[in-house]
Swiss-Prot record:
Keywords: Alkaloid metabolism, Endoplasmic reticulum, Heme, Iron, Membrane, Metal-binding, Monooxygenase, Oxidoreductase, Transmembrane, Transmembrane helix. It comes from Coptis japonica (Japanese goldthread). The chain crosses the membrane at residues 6-21. This is Corytuberine synthase. It is found in: Endoplasmic reticulum membrane. The gene is CYP80G2. Belongs to the cytochrome P450 family. Cytochrome P450 that catalyzes an intramolecular C-C phenol coupling of (S)-reticuline in magnoflorine biosynthesis. Catalyzes the formation of (S)-corytuberine from (S)-reticuline, and also, with a lover efficiency, the 4'-O-demethylation of codamine to produce orientaline, and subsequent C-C-phenol coupling of orientaline.
Amino acid sequence: MDLQIALFSLIPVILVFILLLKPKYKNLPPGPHPWPLIGNLPILFTNTEVPLHITLANMARTHGPIMILWLGTQPTVMASTAEAAMEILKTHDRIFSARHIRMSFRLKHHIKYSLVWSDCTDYWKLLRKIVRTEIFSPKMLQAQSHVREQKVAELIDFLRSKEGQVVKISQFVFGTLLNILGNVVFSKDVFVYGDETDKGGIQNLIREMLMIGAEPNVAEFYPSLEELDLQGLKKKCDERFIRVMKMWEGTVKERKANRNEESKDMLDVLLANDFNDAQINALFLETFGPGSETSSATIEWVIAELIKSPKEMAKVRKELNEVVGTSTIKESDLPQLPYLQACIKEAMRLHPAAPFLLPRRAAETCEVMGYTIPKNSQVLVNAYAIGRDPKSWKDPSTFWPERFLESDVDFHGAHYQFIPFGSGRRTCVGMPLATRTIPLIVGSLVHNYDFGLPGGNRPEDLKMNEMLSLTLAIDPSLCVVPKARA
Protein backbone atom coordinates (compact mmCIF):
# COMPACT_ATOMS: atom_id res chain seq x y z
CA MET A 1 0.00 0.00 0.00
CA ASP A 2 1.27 3.45 -0.85
CA LEU A 3 2.65 5.31 2.17
CA GLN A 4 0.50 8.40 1.60
CA ILE A 5 -2.71 6.36 1.30
CA ALA A 6 -1.84 4.47 4.47
CA LEU A 7 -1.26 7.71 6.35
CA PHE A 8 -4.39 9.54 5.28
CA SER A 9 -6.67 6.54 5.77
CA LEU A 10 -5.59 6.37 9.39
CA ILE A 11 -5.83 10.04 10.34
CA PRO A 12 -8.65 9.48 12.89
CA VAL A 13 -6.71 6.75 14.67
CA ILE A 14 -3.48 8.72 14.50
CA LEU A 15 -5.15 11.80 15.99
CA VAL A 16 -6.05 9.85 19.12
CA PHE A 17 -2.49 8.64 19.56
CA ILE A 18 -1.10 12.13 18.94
CA LEU A 19 -3.26 13.58 21.69
CA LEU A 20 -2.24 10.84 24.08
CA LEU A 21 1.45 11.03 23.23
CA LYS A 22 2.12 14.78 23.21
CA PRO A 23 5.73 15.51 24.17
CA LYS A 24 6.13 16.00 27.92
CA TYR A 25 9.74 17.15 27.82
CA LYS A 26 11.14 20.65 28.02
CA ASN A 27 14.44 21.95 26.68
CA LEU A 28 14.37 19.68 23.65
CA PRO A 29 16.94 20.27 20.89
CA PRO A 30 15.99 22.85 18.25
CA GLY A 31 14.37 21.73 15.04
CA PRO A 32 11.72 22.64 12.47
CA HIS A 33 8.25 23.23 13.86
CA PRO A 34 6.19 20.01 13.57
CA TRP A 35 2.78 19.86 11.93
CA PRO A 36 -0.18 18.37 13.80
CA LEU A 37 -0.60 14.64 13.17
CA ILE A 38 2.37 14.25 10.85
CA GLY A 39 5.19 16.12 12.55
CA ASN A 40 8.03 16.95 10.15
CA LEU A 41 7.23 14.26 7.58
CA PRO A 42 6.34 16.78 4.83
CA ILE A 43 9.78 18.39 5.06
CA LEU A 44 11.50 15.06 4.68
CA PHE A 45 9.45 13.28 2.04
CA THR A 46 7.86 15.90 -0.22
CA ASN A 47 11.03 17.28 -1.83
CA THR A 48 12.02 14.31 -3.98
CA GLU A 49 14.59 16.33 -5.95
CA VAL A 50 16.97 16.56 -2.98
CA PRO A 51 18.10 13.30 -1.31
CA LEU A 52 17.19 12.97 2.35
CA HIS A 53 20.77 12.99 3.65
CA ILE A 54 21.44 16.30 1.90
CA THR A 55 18.16 17.79 3.17
CA LEU A 56 19.10 16.87 6.74
CA ALA A 57 22.65 18.19 6.36
CA ASN A 58 21.22 21.51 5.13
CA MET A 59 18.74 21.63 8.02
CA ALA A 60 21.57 21.12 10.51
CA ARG A 61 23.18 24.33 9.27
CA THR A 62 20.04 26.14 10.40
CA HIS A 63 19.18 24.30 13.61
CA GLY A 64 22.61 23.38 14.93
CA PRO A 65 24.74 20.33 15.76
CA ILE A 66 21.91 18.62 17.65
CA MET A 67 18.40 18.88 16.28
CA ILE A 68 15.13 17.06 16.78
CA LEU A 69 12.64 15.97 14.14
CA TRP A 70 9.19 14.54 14.74
CA LEU A 71 8.40 11.66 12.40
CA GLY A 72 4.71 11.29 13.10
CA THR A 73 4.66 10.71 16.86
CA GLN A 74 8.27 9.63 17.09
CA PRO A 75 11.18 11.90 18.06
CA THR A 76 14.39 11.52 16.07
CA VAL A 77 17.53 13.28 17.29
CA MET A 78 20.24 14.06 14.73
CA ALA A 79 23.92 14.74 15.54
CA SER A 80 25.62 16.57 12.66
CA THR A 81 29.08 17.67 13.86
CA ALA A 82 32.14 15.87 15.16
CA GLU A 83 31.58 17.32 18.63
CA ALA A 84 27.96 16.15 18.71
CA ALA A 85 28.98 12.72 17.43
CA MET A 86 31.52 12.38 20.25
CA GLU A 87 28.79 13.15 22.79
CA ILE A 88 26.61 10.37 21.36
CA LEU A 89 29.27 7.77 20.56
CA LYS A 90 31.71 8.30 23.44
CA THR A 91 30.45 10.44 26.32
CA HIS A 92 27.01 8.78 26.41
CA ASP A 93 27.88 5.60 24.53
CA ARG A 94 26.20 3.34 27.11
CA ILE A 95 22.88 5.17 26.92
CA PHE A 96 22.88 5.36 23.13
CA SER A 97 24.14 1.84 22.45
CA ALA A 98 20.56 0.54 22.28
CA ARG A 99 19.18 0.02 18.79
CA HIS A 100 16.23 1.57 17.03
CA ILE A 101 15.09 -1.34 14.87
CA ARG A 102 13.51 -0.74 11.49
CA MET A 103 10.00 -2.22 11.55
CA SER A 104 10.62 -4.25 8.40
CA PHE A 105 13.56 -5.99 10.08
CA ARG A 106 11.69 -7.01 13.23
CA LEU A 107 11.51 -10.59 12.04
CA LYS A 108 10.62 -13.37 14.46
CA HIS A 109 13.45 -15.54 13.12
CA HIS A 110 16.06 -12.86 13.47
CA ILE A 111 15.97 -10.07 16.04
CA LYS A 112 16.44 -12.22 19.15
CA TYR A 113 19.83 -13.40 17.88
CA SER A 114 20.90 -10.36 15.89
CA LEU A 115 24.37 -8.89 16.27
CA VAL A 116 23.40 -5.71 14.41
CA TRP A 117 19.96 -4.96 15.86
CA SER A 118 19.75 -6.47 19.34
CA ASP A 119 20.51 -4.46 22.47
CA CYS A 120 23.74 -4.96 24.40
CA THR A 121 22.62 -8.11 26.21
CA ASP A 122 24.91 -10.82 27.58
CA TYR A 123 24.24 -12.85 24.43
CA TRP A 124 25.16 -9.87 22.23
CA LYS A 125 28.42 -9.43 24.17
CA LEU A 126 29.25 -13.12 23.75
CA LEU A 127 28.47 -13.05 20.04
CA ARG A 128 30.50 -9.90 19.46
CA LYS A 129 33.44 -11.42 21.34
CA ILE A 130 33.31 -14.58 19.20
CA VAL A 131 33.13 -12.56 15.98
CA ARG A 132 36.00 -10.27 16.94
CA THR A 133 38.35 -12.84 18.48
CA GLU A 134 37.64 -15.94 16.38
CA ILE A 135 36.02 -14.99 13.06
CA PHE A 136 37.50 -11.58 12.21
CA SER A 137 40.63 -11.88 14.32
CA PRO A 138 43.93 -10.88 12.67
CA LYS A 139 45.06 -14.52 12.74
CA MET A 140 41.89 -15.79 11.03
CA LEU A 141 41.89 -13.00 8.44
CA GLN A 142 45.53 -13.64 7.63
CA ALA A 143 44.84 -17.36 7.19
CA GLN A 144 42.06 -16.57 4.70
CA SER A 145 43.92 -13.91 2.70
CA HIS A 146 44.71 -16.31 -0.16
CA VAL A 147 40.99 -16.98 -0.60
CA ARG A 148 40.18 -13.28 -0.95
CA GLU A 149 43.05 -12.87 -3.40
CA GLN A 150 41.71 -15.80 -5.43
CA LYS A 151 38.17 -14.38 -5.54
CA VAL A 152 39.46 -10.99 -6.71
CA ALA A 153 41.61 -12.71 -9.36
CA GLU A 154 38.45 -14.43 -10.62
CA LEU A 155 36.77 -11.02 -10.99
CA ILE A 156 39.76 -9.67 -12.94
CA ASP A 157 39.76 -12.74 -15.21
CA PHE A 158 36.01 -12.52 -15.80
CA LEU A 159 36.19 -8.87 -16.83
CA ARG A 160 38.42 -9.89 -19.73
CA SER A 161 35.38 -11.55 -21.27
CA LYS A 162 33.59 -8.19 -20.96
CA GLU A 163 36.38 -6.12 -22.49
CA GLY A 164 34.95 -3.48 -24.80
CA GLN A 165 31.41 -4.01 -23.46
CA VAL A 166 29.38 -1.81 -21.13
CA VAL A 167 29.57 -3.23 -17.61
CA LYS A 168 27.67 -2.20 -14.48
CA ILE A 169 30.57 -2.28 -12.07
CA SER A 170 28.48 -2.81 -8.93
CA GLN A 171 26.92 -6.03 -10.22
CA PHE A 172 30.17 -7.94 -10.45
CA VAL A 173 31.85 -6.27 -7.48
CA PHE A 174 28.82 -7.21 -5.37
CA GLY A 175 29.07 -10.78 -6.63
CA THR A 176 32.77 -10.92 -5.79
CA LEU A 177 32.07 -9.67 -2.28
CA LEU A 178 29.37 -12.31 -1.86
CA ASN A 179 31.85 -15.00 -2.84
CA ILE A 180 34.44 -13.63 -0.42
CA LEU A 181 31.83 -13.63 2.34
CA GLY A 182 30.57 -17.06 1.29
CA ASN A 183 34.05 -18.43 1.87
CA VAL A 184 34.32 -16.62 5.19
CA VAL A 185 30.97 -18.06 6.26
CA PHE A 186 30.99 -21.65 4.98
CA SER A 187 33.86 -21.98 2.48
CA LYS A 188 31.68 -21.85 -0.64
CA ASP A 189 30.98 -19.46 -3.52
CA VAL A 190 27.41 -18.17 -3.76
CA PHE A 191 27.63 -16.11 -6.97
CA VAL A 192 28.23 -17.38 -10.50
CA TYR A 193 29.90 -15.06 -13.01
CA GLY A 194 28.01 -15.01 -16.30
CA ASP A 195 24.59 -15.31 -14.68
CA GLU A 196 23.58 -11.75 -15.52
CA THR A 197 20.15 -11.96 -13.91
CA ASP A 198 20.78 -14.01 -10.75
CA LYS A 199 17.01 -14.44 -10.60
CA GLY A 200 16.09 -15.94 -7.27
CA GLY A 201 19.76 -15.93 -6.25
CA ILE A 202 21.24 -14.60 -3.06
CA GLN A 203 22.41 -11.36 -4.71
CA ASN A 204 18.89 -10.34 -5.72
CA LEU A 205 17.29 -11.54 -2.49
CA ILE A 206 19.75 -9.63 -0.31
CA ARG A 207 19.28 -6.45 -2.32
CA GLU A 208 15.49 -6.85 -2.29
CA MET A 209 15.54 -7.19 1.50
CA LEU A 210 17.67 -4.08 1.87
CA MET A 211 15.43 -2.10 -0.49
CA ILE A 212 12.30 -3.19 1.38
CA GLY A 213 13.92 -2.22 4.67
CA ALA A 214 14.71 1.23 3.30
CA GLU A 215 11.15 2.00 2.21
CA PRO A 216 9.31 4.54 4.40
CA ASN A 217 7.03 2.55 6.69
CA VAL A 218 3.97 4.14 8.28
CA ALA A 219 4.53 1.99 11.38
CA GLU A 220 7.88 3.74 11.92
CA PHE A 221 5.98 6.97 12.51
CA TYR A 222 3.04 5.45 14.42
CA PRO A 223 4.38 2.32 16.21
CA SER A 224 0.96 1.28 17.50
CA LEU A 225 0.15 0.30 13.92
CA GLU A 226 3.07 -2.12 13.64
CA GLU A 227 1.04 -5.32 13.93
CA LEU A 228 -1.19 -4.26 11.02
CA ASP A 229 1.79 -4.20 8.61
CA LEU A 230 -0.30 -1.94 6.37
CA GLN A 231 2.22 -1.85 3.52
CA GLY A 232 3.14 -5.51 3.82
CA LEU A 233 6.82 -4.65 4.20
CA LYS A 234 7.51 -6.94 7.13
CA LYS A 235 5.81 -9.82 5.33
CA LYS A 236 7.87 -9.22 2.18
CA CYS A 237 11.10 -9.06 4.17
CA ASP A 238 10.22 -12.20 6.13
CA GLU A 239 9.47 -14.12 2.93
CA ARG A 240 12.87 -13.25 1.47
CA PHE A 241 14.66 -14.08 4.69
CA ILE A 242 13.16 -17.57 4.65
CA ARG A 243 14.21 -18.03 1.01
CA VAL A 244 17.75 -16.90 1.78
CA MET A 245 17.99 -19.26 4.76
CA LYS A 246 17.08 -22.21 2.55
CA MET A 247 20.11 -21.47 0.37
CA TRP A 248 22.51 -22.52 3.11
CA GLU A 249 20.23 -24.92 4.99
CA GLY A 250 21.76 -27.97 3.27
CA THR A 251 25.30 -26.75 3.90
CA VAL A 252 24.63 -26.36 7.62
CA LYS A 253 23.08 -29.84 7.88
CA GLU A 254 25.98 -31.40 5.99
CA ARG A 255 28.56 -29.65 8.17
CA LYS A 256 26.81 -30.80 11.34
CA ALA A 257 26.91 -34.38 10.11
CA ASN A 258 30.51 -34.23 8.93
CA ARG A 259 32.52 -32.03 11.25
CA ASN A 260 36.10 -31.28 10.22
CA GLU A 261 38.25 -30.18 13.10
CA GLU A 262 40.83 -28.68 10.75
CA SER A 263 38.32 -26.42 8.96
CA LYS A 264 37.87 -23.01 10.55
CA ASP A 265 35.28 -20.86 8.81
CA MET A 266 32.44 -18.98 10.51
CA LEU A 267 30.15 -22.01 10.48
CA ASP A 268 32.79 -24.15 12.21
CA VAL A 269 33.28 -21.52 14.90
CA LEU A 270 29.55 -21.20 15.54
CA LEU A 271 29.02 -24.96 15.71
CA ALA A 272 31.98 -25.31 18.07
CA ASN A 273 30.23 -22.78 20.33
CA ASP A 274 26.96 -24.81 20.19
CA PHE A 275 24.97 -22.23 18.24
CA ASN A 276 21.54 -23.38 17.07
CA ASP A 277 20.09 -22.91 13.57
CA ALA A 278 18.28 -19.66 14.42
CA GLN A 279 21.47 -18.13 15.81
CA ILE A 280 23.47 -19.26 12.78
CA ASN A 281 20.88 -17.93 10.33
CA ALA A 282 20.79 -14.51 11.99
CA LEU A 283 24.56 -14.05 11.83
CA PHE A 284 24.83 -15.40 8.28
CA LEU A 285 22.19 -12.96 7.05
CA GLU A 286 23.90 -9.98 8.66
CA THR A 287 27.24 -11.03 7.24
CA PHE A 288 25.94 -11.28 3.68
CA GLY A 289 23.60 -8.27 3.83
CA PRO A 290 25.23 -5.13 5.25
CA GLY A 291 28.72 -6.52 4.66
CA SER A 292 28.35 -6.86 0.90
CA GLU A 293 26.19 -3.83 0.15
CA THR A 294 28.23 -1.24 2.05
CA SER A 295 31.56 -2.44 0.65
CA SER A 296 30.13 -2.62 -2.87
CA ALA A 297 28.85 0.96 -2.65
CA THR A 298 32.21 2.18 -1.34
CA ILE A 299 34.17 0.48 -4.13
CA GLU A 300 31.84 1.94 -6.75
CA TRP A 301 32.34 5.45 -5.34
CA VAL A 302 36.13 5.09 -5.26
CA ILE A 303 36.25 3.94 -8.89
CA ALA A 304 33.90 6.76 -9.93
CA GLU A 305 35.97 9.41 -8.15
CA LEU A 306 39.17 8.10 -9.74
CA ILE A 307 37.64 8.03 -13.22
CA LYS A 308 36.49 11.60 -12.75
CA SER A 309 39.94 12.60 -11.42
CA PRO A 310 42.55 11.39 -13.97
CA LYS A 311 45.47 12.95 -12.07
CA GLU A 312 44.61 11.02 -8.92
CA MET A 313 44.07 7.85 -10.97
CA ALA A 314 47.56 8.28 -12.45
CA LYS A 315 49.06 8.66 -8.97
CA VAL A 316 47.38 5.45 -7.79
CA ARG A 317 48.70 3.56 -10.81
CA LYS A 318 52.19 4.97 -10.37
CA GLU A 319 52.20 3.76 -6.78
CA LEU A 320 50.92 0.33 -7.84
CA ASN A 321 53.56 0.05 -10.55
CA GLU A 322 56.32 0.89 -8.07
CA VAL A 323 55.12 -1.53 -5.39
CA VAL A 324 53.50 -4.35 -7.35
CA GLY A 325 54.94 -4.00 -10.84
CA THR A 326 53.50 -6.58 -13.22
CA SER A 327 52.58 -8.96 -10.40
CA THR A 328 49.16 -9.58 -8.90
CA ILE A 329 48.28 -7.45 -5.88
CA LYS A 330 48.49 -9.31 -2.58
CA GLU A 331 47.02 -8.24 0.73
CA SER A 332 50.57 -8.02 2.03
CA ASP A 333 51.13 -5.16 -0.46
CA LEU A 334 48.34 -2.99 0.96
CA PRO A 335 50.34 -1.32 3.79
CA GLN A 336 52.80 -0.13 1.13
CA LEU A 337 50.06 1.64 -0.87
CA PRO A 338 49.29 4.79 1.15
CA TYR A 339 47.94 6.81 -1.77
CA LEU A 340 45.47 4.06 -2.71
CA GLN A 341 44.37 3.94 0.93
CA ALA A 342 44.03 7.75 0.98
CA CYS A 343 41.78 7.66 -2.10
CA ILE A 344 39.53 5.11 -0.41
CA LYS A 345 39.34 7.19 2.77
CA GLU A 346 38.52 10.30 0.75
CA ALA A 347 35.68 8.53 -1.06
CA MET A 348 34.37 7.27 2.29
CA ARG A 349 34.47 10.81 3.66
CA LEU A 350 32.54 12.24 0.74
CA HIS A 351 30.15 9.32 0.26
CA PRO A 352 29.82 7.26 3.46
CA ALA A 353 28.01 4.03 2.59
CA ALA A 354 25.85 4.43 5.71
CA PRO A 355 25.37 8.22 5.87
CA PHE A 356 23.48 8.05 9.19
CA LEU A 357 25.39 4.99 10.46
CA LEU A 358 22.88 2.56 11.99
CA PRO A 359 20.07 4.05 14.09
CA ARG A 360 20.53 4.07 17.84
CA ARG A 361 17.97 4.49 20.61
CA ALA A 362 18.14 6.41 23.86
CA ALA A 363 17.84 3.74 26.56
CA GLU A 364 17.00 6.47 29.06
CA THR A 365 16.42 10.21 29.11
CA CYS A 366 19.68 12.15 29.21
CA GLU A 367 21.21 15.54 28.45
CA VAL A 368 23.44 16.15 25.43
CA MET A 369 25.05 19.54 24.74
CA GLY A 370 22.56 21.14 27.13
CA TYR A 371 19.45 19.58 25.53
CA THR A 372 17.12 16.88 26.80
CA ILE A 373 17.03 13.68 24.73
CA PRO A 374 13.83 11.77 25.59
CA LYS A 375 13.94 8.08 26.40
CA ASN A 376 13.37 5.83 23.35
CA SER A 377 14.17 8.60 20.87
CA GLN A 378 15.73 7.38 17.65
CA VAL A 379 19.26 8.82 17.50
CA LEU A 380 21.12 9.27 14.22
CA VAL A 381 24.67 10.44 13.59
CA ASN A 382 24.93 12.23 10.25
CA ALA A 383 28.31 10.97 9.04
CA TYR A 384 27.61 12.58 5.66
CA ALA A 385 27.23 16.06 7.15
CA ILE A 386 30.22 15.54 9.43
CA GLY A 387 32.41 14.46 6.52
CA ARG A 388 31.59 17.69 4.68
CA ASP A 389 31.76 20.07 7.63
CA PRO A 390 34.08 22.99 6.75
CA LYS A 391 34.99 23.28 10.44
CA SER A 392 36.65 19.87 10.21
CA TRP A 393 37.75 19.74 6.58
CA LYS A 394 39.44 22.15 4.18
CA ASP A 395 37.56 22.37 0.86
CA PRO A 396 35.15 19.69 2.10
CA SER A 397 33.41 19.08 -1.24
CA THR A 398 36.66 18.46 -3.13
CA PHE A 399 38.10 15.00 -3.80
CA TRP A 400 41.60 15.54 -2.41
CA PRO A 401 43.18 12.29 -1.12
CA GLU A 402 46.36 14.08 -0.06
CA ARG A 403 44.53 15.39 3.01
CA PHE A 404 44.85 11.90 4.53
CA LEU A 405 48.57 11.76 3.80
CA GLU A 406 49.08 14.99 5.71
CA SER A 407 47.22 13.97 8.88
CA ASP A 408 46.81 11.00 11.20
CA VAL A 409 43.00 10.94 10.87
CA ASP A 410 41.71 7.41 10.36
CA PHE A 411 38.40 5.53 10.49
CA HIS A 412 38.92 3.40 13.60
CA GLY A 413 36.56 5.49 15.71
CA ALA A 414 38.84 7.86 17.61
CA HIS A 415 38.53 10.76 15.12
CA TYR A 416 34.90 11.85 15.18
CA GLN A 417 35.18 13.96 12.04
CA PHE A 418 35.60 10.69 10.09
CA ILE A 419 33.47 7.76 11.27
CA PRO A 420 32.34 5.68 8.27
CA PHE A 421 32.45 2.54 10.47
CA GLY A 422 30.94 4.19 13.52
CA SER A 423 32.56 4.37 16.95
CA GLY A 424 32.20 3.04 20.46
CA ARG A 425 30.77 -0.33 21.41
CA ARG A 426 28.66 -0.34 18.22
CA THR A 427 31.63 0.07 15.87
CA CYS A 428 31.17 -2.12 12.78
CA VAL A 429 32.61 -5.55 13.62
CA GLY A 430 33.24 -6.19 9.92
CA MET A 431 35.71 -3.30 9.65
CA PRO A 432 38.83 -5.53 9.77
CA LEU A 433 37.55 -7.53 6.79
CA ALA A 434 36.31 -4.48 4.86
CA THR A 435 39.61 -2.64 5.23
CA ARG A 436 41.39 -5.57 3.61
CA THR A 437 38.83 -6.35 0.93
CA ILE A 438 38.03 -2.86 -0.39
CA PRO A 439 41.62 -1.77 -1.22
CA LEU A 440 42.39 -5.22 -2.66
CA ILE A 441 39.48 -4.97 -5.11
CA VAL A 442 39.97 -1.29 -5.98
CA GLY A 443 43.71 -1.69 -6.45
CA SER A 444 43.28 -4.80 -8.61
CA LEU A 445 40.68 -3.13 -10.83
CA VAL A 446 42.64 0.05 -11.55
CA HIS A 447 45.94 -1.86 -11.88
CA ASN A 448 44.54 -4.21 -14.53
CA TYR A 449 42.01 -2.10 -16.44
CA ASP A 450 41.38 1.28 -17.96
CA PHE A 451 37.74 2.27 -17.60
CA GLY A 452 36.11 4.22 -20.39
CA LEU A 453 32.60 5.60 -20.21
CA PRO A 454 29.71 4.48 -22.45
CA GLY A 455 29.07 6.54 -25.57
CA GLY A 456 32.56 7.98 -25.53
CA ASN A 457 31.70 10.32 -22.65
CA ARG A 458 34.60 12.15 -21.02
CA PRO A 459 35.55 11.69 -17.34
CA GLU A 460 34.39 15.21 -16.50
CA ASP A 461 30.91 14.29 -17.81
CA LEU A 462 30.49 11.46 -15.29
CA LYS A 463 27.41 12.06 -13.14
CA MET A 464 28.04 11.75 -9.41
CA ASN A 465 24.48 12.06 -8.13
CA GLU A 466 23.69 10.34 -4.84
CA MET A 467 20.72 8.11 -4.10
CA LEU A 468 19.91 7.11 -0.53
CA SER A 469 18.47 3.70 0.17
CA LEU A 470 19.88 1.76 3.11
CA THR A 471 23.25 2.68 1.62
CA LEU A 472 24.41 5.76 -0.26
CA ALA A 473 24.66 4.72 -3.90
CA ILE A 474 25.79 6.51 -7.04
CA ASP A 475 22.86 7.40 -9.30
CA PRO A 476 22.76 6.16 -11.98
CA SER A 477 24.87 3.08 -11.26
CA LEU A 478 28.39 3.37 -12.60
CA CYS A 479 28.67 1.78 -16.04
CA VAL A 480 32.11 1.44 -17.61
CA VAL A 481 33.82 -0.06 -20.63
CA PRO A 482 36.84 -2.05 -19.35
CA LYS A 483 40.00 -2.32 -21.40
CA ALA A 484 42.92 -4.42 -20.18
CA ARG A 485 46.03 -2.38 -19.48
CA ALA A 486 49.25 -3.38 -21.20
